[in-house]
A protein has these predicted regions:
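Active-site and adjacent substrate-binding regions of carbohydrate-active enzymes
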Residues: 1-432
Length: 432
């Protein structure tokens, strides 16, 4: 693709030379798999670039005999939405350089995902052997006014992908409530803004990009309460089969939103609490590159969210790195954080507490965005716990609490503070 962002594709069948070409991808895939890592490629099959061979608006890379824009009788004309007897065409969000693909065309379906050498199948096969696809702007894919083919086409796409690799991960960009795609026959997960990223960011008092894009809604200041966070997350999960819960791609930051740690209004303890909550939720935490080392940036535009990784200056011993390192270790080590149940123990005003539990393993995370120190009651017995194991949390924060009845504790929560506690199970406590 000719642009910096690379979403204006001109050739789906080759890797951009800026990224090393096809051979570089094959080598990367081999090295990753040798180290027990996975590889997911990002793609937009909702639209191409106007310079794509199929469209070829300005003859920038292809001869004037090629493409739908130049040749009204070409097969590729049916790949796009053109007005009758006109060169006017539908494009994504009004961006003329991104003409929208028309999945009414059976020929388009064949070349994108059905044929043995189609776009999506090619990269799942050796020597590339990718492990999944991330689909850009999946929420508007295969939709245009009266043309509403999304569920039909996604079902077909899933079938074709899983034929090549049954374990391939289908990740879709959608910022809203997308439960209709998550019933087992279409996506494996959205980029979970709706049930993770957006709610945690709003709880911290940060603007919501999804709402900011709406000229009316962005005029209404709104900060999510703890009750809102609990309700949104549980509303999202309650609509999904449990196996899909486990697939959720839980993120805080991405290439489309400012990094939380670059907001001056969020202190280090609140940021730590946000990351802890991300790791506590059912599903898989997604760490946006550089967040683990506190990469610099700004909050004013795409370039500020996408600073290059400072490979020669990575401070792997700072507090942020140790935070992610510790949480990644816990997530891998304890079944409570992967297979265990999840329950909100407290959600009022500016304080939220959530537990993960499996047999005798119990972890409780607390985040306060309140300006005031408060005391809260935690019903630990409801998740099989009696009390915290230690007088400090897993990051060394002092815990001040009082046991009530063997099943609940009163706990002091400092202003703008976060805690992650490992707790003693009720059965274990009875033996001590």
């Amino acid at each position: 693709a000719p642009s910096i962002h690379k979403y204006d594709c001109i050739d789906y069948f080759h890797v951009d030379q800026h990224f090393g070409g096809d051979e570089a991808l094959a080598e990367l895939s081999k090295a990753l798999h040798e180290n027990d890592m996975k590889l997911i490629l990002d793609i937009s099959i909702n639209h191409t670039g106007a310079a794509h061979k199929w469209f070829n608006r300005d003859n920038a890379f292809f001869d004037s005999s090629e493409g739908a824009y130049q040749n009204k009788d070409s097969k590729e004309r049916g790949y796009y939405f053109f007005e009758e007897n006109s060169d006017n065409y539908v494009c994504w969000c009004g961006v003329k350089n991104l003409p929208t693909l028309n999945y009414q065309s059976e020929d388009l379906r064949k070349v994108v995902y059905q044929d043995e050498n189609s776009v999506l199948r090619k990269w799942l096969k050796p020597p590339y052997s990718i492990d999944g696809w991330r689909f850009d702007v999946a929420d508007v894919f295969a939709r245009n006014n009266e043309v509403q083919l999304a569920h039909e086409v996604w079902t077909q796409i899933r079938k074709c992908i899983k034929e090549e690799n049954p374990d391939a991960y289908i990740l879709a960009e959608d910022w809203g409530d997308c439960a209709g795609y998550l019933q087992g026959s279409e996506w494996d997960s959205p980029m979970n803004y709706f049930g993770c990223g957006r709610v945690i960011r709003q709880f911290l008092g940060l603007p919501d990009l999804f709402l900011e894009r709406n000229e009316i809604l962005k005029k209404v200041p709104y900060r999510m309460t703890a009750e809102d966070v609990q309700n949104r997350i549980m509303q999202h999960l309650a609509k999904l089969p449990y196996v899909i819960w486990q697939n959720q791609f839980n993120l805080l930051d991405s290439h489309d939103v400012p990094r939380i740690h670059n907001y001056k209004t969020v202190n280090q303890d609140e940021y730590r609490g946000a990351v802890i909550l991300q790791f506590m939720l059912v599903g898989t935490p997604s760490i946006y590159y550089g967040d683990e080392v506190g990469i610099k940036g700004d909050i004013y535009g795409d370039e500020g969210y996408r600073y290059p990784m400072p490979w020669s200056q990575i401070p792997c011993s700072n507090d942020t790195y140790r935070l992610y390192q510790k949480l990644a270790h816990l997530k891998k080590e304890y079944k409570a954080l992967t297979e265990g149940g999840m329950k909100f123990l407290y959600a009022k005003g500016d304080i939220i507490a959530v537990a993960r539990f499996y047999e005798e393993e119990v972890f409780v995370a607390i985040l306060s965005v309140s300006d005031q120190e408060q005391k809260i009651r935690l019903p630990l017995g409801s998740v099989g716990a009696a009390r915290p194991k230690e007088n400090r949390d897993l990051f060394g924060k002092e815990l001040t609490y009082r046991a009530l009845d063997g099943r609940s504790i009163w706990m002091k929560v400092e202003a703008h503070q976060a805690y992650l506690m490992e707790c003693i199970g009720i059965v274990e406590s009875m033996g001590n």
